[in-house]
């Protein structure tokens, strides 16, 4: 199957839904984490802090690496990491000796994916030959709200 620009745009739009899940799912579950595993407020806030800290580090480090590796492998890696981290929210607390360590590992995984998506997605949409780039970029960023 030969992929067209419309496939790239659709995949890009769906990537922002993944980005929204990465940033918003765990905070929605903080009370559940507290009730189920008895985590303190400090531990819960550290999960969100860890997410955004890892994303920022990945943003900084990936800017140059993406040019060497390529956009496609990096986008695939981003989604694999995000999916592994989101699935890890359910599985890793039971696998690790400490539920908190499992949650932190899951957060690091999905934050790495989220950081890559953040760096890659806008340039990909910008590079697509669309007649109305402004509309495509606006639609792209609206998908974050849909996630």
Short names for language-model regions:
Residues 80-97:
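C-terminal ends and interior cores of transmembrane alpha-helices
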Residues 134-147:
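Glycine-rich segments within core transmembrane alpha-helices of 12-TM secondary carriers
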Residues 72-75, 103:
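Primarily marks hydrophobic transmembrane alpha-helices of the MFS/SLC 12-helix fold
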Residues 116-129:
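Intracellular juxtamembrane helix-capping segments at the cytosolic ends
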Residues 99-116:
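Hydrophobic core of transmembrane alpha-helices in multi-pass small-molecule transporters
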Residues 22, 54-58, 113, 147:
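MFS transmembrane alpha-helix packing/gate-lining sites
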């Amino acid at each position: 199957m030969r992929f067209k620009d419309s496939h790239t745009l659709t995949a890009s739009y769906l990537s922002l839904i993944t980005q929204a899940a990465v940033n918003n799912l765990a905070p929605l579950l903080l009370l559940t984490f507290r009730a189920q595993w008895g985590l303190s407020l400090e531990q819960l806030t550290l999960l969100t802090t860890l997410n955004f800290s890892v994303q920022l580090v990945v943003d900084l480090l990936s800017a140059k690496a993406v040019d060497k590796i390529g956009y496609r492998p990096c986008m695939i890696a981003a989604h694999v990491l995000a999916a592994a981290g989101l699935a890890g929210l359910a599985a890793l607390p039971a696998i690790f000796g400490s539920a908190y360590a499992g949650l932190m590992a899951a957060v690091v995984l999905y934050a790495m994916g989220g950081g890559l998506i953040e760096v890659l997605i806008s340039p990909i949409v910008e590079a697509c030959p669309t007649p109305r780039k402004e509309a495509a970029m606006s639609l792209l960023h609206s998908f974050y709200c849909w996630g």
